[in-house]
Amino acid sequence: MKIVTTVQEMQHITKELRASGKSIGFVPTMGYLHEGHATLLRKAREENEIVVLSVFVNPLQFGPNEDLDRYPRDIDRDENVAKENGVDYLFYPSVEEMYPAEQTTTVEVVKRTDVLCGKQRPGHFAGVATVLMKLFNITLPTRAYFGMKDAQQVAVIEGFVADFNIPVIIVPVDIVREEDGLAKSSRNVYLSQKERKEAPHLYRSLCMAKERIEAGERNAEIITTLVKEYIETYTKGTVDYADLYAYPSLQVVDQIEGRIILAIAVKFENVRLIDNITLTVK
């Protein structure tokens, strides 16, 4: 595995690889890699001749009161995960390398951002789309892999790639969970012992809702109320949202039909966790 720290070298490598006909699978991350990321890397390894991983904590997607400085970092661990999962190139640029001067251009996302996490994080998805435009141009991927844990991000990226005719295939990958159902996340380390015991109830609330939908319930408000009440009963967390939308358009639905997403965000003392399920309802 080769570690690359400059845009110029990474772009030179990927241009040569693509010119020689090689397919490139790209996994963009902010580091502190866990089994969820490893799953993305293994999928990229299966489907491409070359795998590129980027580790870059992107300041553009953090708001003024968000946890940029607190975001966990451990490049040695990331290198080990990368090597174990068949990465060919680890792109690890500094902030100065990615943003040598103030941006004269950023990507503004105008749809799919005013709900769920995007509603409370104005500018977040503009930061995501801007860094991805840069990373796609640097790594020239055939396919790029994203976890469905952040399903809103996947919906935004799919729209952005289609709108700008970017020649990359977006591959969404299912959420990876702990044995007790908790979605794997770099932020789980901030849960107290007691909160960690309560946290699996987030996924259980979604499973309960899925069962109700499969049993015939079609009223979106009834389902989201059930989820909120379940989480408030079984955890000390505060429900930020429990919402149901058409997917990937993220349009509001009153009656449940077609492909939908049921997504939740719950605040514990030192961390906010998100989870979701998507399902197709006939």
Swiss-Prot record:
Alphabetical GO biological process terms: pantothenate biosynthetic process
| Amino-acid positions noted as binding beta-alanine in the UniProt annotation, renumbered to this chain | Q61
The name this protein carries in UniProt is Pantothenate synthetase
Location in the cell reads: Cytoplasm
Which HAMAP family does UniProt cross-reference here?
PanC
Listed pathway(s):
Cofactor biosynthesis; (R)-pantothenate biosynthesis; (R)-pantothenate from (R)-pantoate and beta-alanine: step 1/1
Residue numbers binding (R)-pantoate? Q61, Q153
> Which GO molecular function annotations are given, in alphabetical order?
ATP binding; pantoate-beta-alanine ligase activity
Membrane-crossing segments per the record: none
Binding positions for ATP per the UniProt entry: 30-37, 147-150, 176, 184-187
> What's this chain's function?
Catalyzes the condensation of pantoate with beta-alanine in an ATP-dependent reaction via a pantoyl-adenylate intermediate.
Misc note: The reaction proceeds by a bi uni uni bi ping pong mechanism.
Q: Which UniProt keywords apply?
A: ATP-binding, Cytoplasm, Ligase, Nucleotide-binding, Pantothenate biosynthesis
